[in-house]
């Protein structure tokens, strides 16, 4: 089915964001794991995989609309050098995605592509949950301090692979 060119462009922008997020969350997962914050690392690994599912949904929709998914371009990764920076970097990326998805959903509605609109709205809802989670983590750090916050996320002595 031939899709609206601007809708396909928005879908590719969403795909680019998700591909970037996969890598950013994965590297943060590996950093957290390396620092011994195994419980926290598990959450970041799960987020990376969730972003992969989002990318798959964009890819599927682009192909359905006879577009071509551009998987060769990523945005610059925002990599934190400590726990608080990791959360701040991921929060900035999630806000960026939410803003894009809101703009895209509005355009798709006007273009009468309700399936693409619904996809953007569904993923926007997921991003809002991520934003809420990350803001809560920053609030906790502010209230209990970084040392106590990270202490809660230390795992066992076994290495995670």
Label each residue range with its predicted role.
Residues 1-161:
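Iron-associated oxidoreductase/ferritin-like identity signal
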